[in-house]
Amino acid sequence: MLTYKISPSSISGSVDVPPSKSHTLRAIFWASLSRGTSTINNPLESPDSEAMIQACKQLGAKIYKKSSSLEITGTPHLRLPKDIAIDAGSSGIVFRFFTALAAIFSEKVTITGSSQLQRRPIAPLIRALENFGATFSYQRDPYTLPFSVLGPISSGYTEVLGEDSQYASALAMACSLAEGPFSFTIINPKERPWFKLTLWWLEQLAIPYSQSEENTYSFVGKSRPEGFSYTVGGDFSSAAFLAVAALLSQSPHPTYLRNLNMQDVQGDKELFVLLKKLGANIVFENDIVIIFPSTISGGNIDMDPFIDALPILAVLCCFATSPSHLYNARGAKDKESDRIVAITEELQKMGACIQPCHDGLLINPSPLYGASMFSHNDHRIAMALSIAAMHASGDSSISDTECVKKTFPNFIQILNSLHANIQEYHEPISMWTTGSGQDLIGSCPC
């Protein structure tokens, strides 16, 4: 089991932000379904990327890895071999996208994945696909992996719950490829910027769609994009961890985050706008974001535009000058972990004054102290706790941190290059007791 040992430290310097996971996975997906050959430059190398590559190879795509790019020749015909099984690994995007894609075929497709994926919701997407004519059969409980999908879906209208943007994104991709026309309405849409990112990809690939009402979208269907060339920019979600470390730094020098384009459609870029409103001294200069150590105020923060930033914002708010309420974050409960519970449990171990509420977190500023913590097998929890530990009094340890490779494989190396003091070591796997949180949650010391 990989464990971090973290001593108090501050960062400054200049680094390249790792490539965007969301763009990388969408680029691989669409290149594999395009006519001709596509080139993806600077893709993120991660377990999720590998899961997408292996799934697309099963469609018939030819994918060649080069030193800093992928060359992908799309499958010439949208057909599948019999009894195909797609392993989504631990990737929510591969899980949702291939569930929807499988529904356009007349061959049965089995979807499998890790035990972590088995707790992640899929029912709203399945119900929408069933309304289009797909059928599902389950090896265990309904709406849980593994299950089989049998299409093809046929033209019509449906509704899909918008509590997770990936449902609508997956449905939009299936409706673009299947024989249509199709239309659907997103009910109570959340995480809007991430669905907009999916629509941006459709626009770049000249795949037609229309929006008739605020949340209703229509698709002609039977679209096949042409091969393309795309360079993946930096991941604003990953950059958030470096940004908070830079804001809390005691160094007199700024931190330069390269490879961040503020014109990118990634949802989490709005987090940097929020940080400025809270008092952060941030300068945007071409594709570089310059972050100076700053004093941050708390406040009422709507998390919906950047839901993945909840753990690291919770850490930042512990060091703010006033209380904070992170709200509209119900979706954070259904990520790799229940992030509302997970970040509360672990920060309370450090002495944080933090409590969950019905859709988010209440946080009063408080000093943090070194502690032994657990990642909950969630990359964003592990990275957020790492930044918290850098600014705590005393040393800390975080166990089960292999999950960080999901989005930020060189996270520790980059932090240490900026003068952090973090060591990695392997310890024997043991039965780690995480508890239910009942002994901690609600015991806020303030």
Swiss-Prot record:
Enzyme Commission designation: 2.5.1.19
UniProt keyword list: Amino-acid biosynthesis, Aromatic amino acid biosynthesis, Cytoplasm, Transferase
InterPro entries referenced in this protein's UniProt entry, alphabetically: Enolpyruvate_Tfrase_dom (IPR001986), Enolpyruvate_Tfrase_sf (IPR036968), EPSP_synthase (IPR006264), EPSP_synthase_CS (IPR023193), RNA3'P_cycl/enolpyr_Trfase_a/b (IPR013792)
Domain of life where this protein originates: Bacteria
Reactions catalysed, as given in the entry: 3-phosphoshikimate + phosphoenolpyruvate = 5-O-(1-carboxyvinyl)-3-phosphoshikimate + phosphate
A single Gene Ontology CC term: cytoplasm
Function: Catalyzes the transfer of the enolpyruvyl moiety of phosphoenolpyruvate (PEP) to the 5-hydroxyl of shikimate-3-phosphate (S3P) to produce enolpyruvyl shikimate-3-phosphate and inorganic phosphate.
Protein's recorded name: 3-phosphoshikimate 1-carboxyvinyltransferase
